[in-house]
């Protein structure tokens, strides 16, 4: 009998119960991270090494739900676009054989892609690890649950983030489809049972968003997590920009028009900062009481919460996402970041190294450093906002802590 998966699972679970160990590991990772990016920021030339730390692959832009606050809503379910999804043979050629590279999968709803398990197998065979995948969980059937558990047992799949917005009926309303919560719960049960059977060290978290429709029930997410057998909650603060911030970003980028910006654009997000503060604090307190791990993105700490939820308020900080992660669409086209959809290359025509070191990518990174952050970056899940406390900077702003970013 192979005891390795069982041992890995036991060690991982034990480590998560030791706050001091967790803190020390996080601080070590932070110091490593700071050392790496220090060179990028000091040089200010926009270069970021030969290859990224990881790739975020938007496996599909098809989705089976209709979420009210989805920041990529305008990119979803475009007629016929699914035909551009890279076939597995093309996918093999498009991505480099680079053992140790991290890939993360998002969408859209990735399980709308029928060959998604084949996609993951391609990456596993290349020696990659999957840092996380995001899903709404509604179409995780027995076959997929077993396959995901097997990929976790083999050490490929590390973390699954399941998007949930509140208790049963509230979640259904936010997602725009009746019965969504029950289908998600059923998918999670299948996944957990399959992982337990294989003793697979698979982390599962629920991911929720600060939104007007669900704010009053935010603290109830702890009960939802316990009902679903999940011990971690990731919170995304609402991601949005004002029309003026979009226009200024377009000017700074020298873009032709605002079509390159993909975010929720509004002059009024409909959220009172005092209410947000109260509800987030209730959620954090309840997580502590119940032993539920908690993380949020971006790190909107007390000194900046009012400004964050006041449209037009200037926020400062930094974003290192384009220095660390390549954002690759289902068609192989690479974009500067999730919000700024300027094409920087195409993996069906260039190598990842050629894209990553290409002049378009380098020039945009250089412009980002010169500006600190662009106006549309101020309320993005990838940004590191200032001011922040030392505790706020413990978690490395890697592509996936617990909060996975809105799908």
Question: Predicted regions span which residues?
Answer:
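A structural signal for short, well-ordered beta-strand segments
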Residues: 55, 59, 160, 206-208, ...
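Short, solvent-exposed loop/turn segments at secondary-structure junctions
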Residues: 62-64, 110, 139, 167, ...
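Amphipathic alpha-helical recognition patches that constitute DNA-binding helices
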Residues: 54, 58, 205, 234, ...
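Flexible mid-to-C-terminal extensions adjoining Fe-S/redox cofactors in radical SAM and related proteins
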Residues: 7-10, 37-51, 307-322, 327, ...
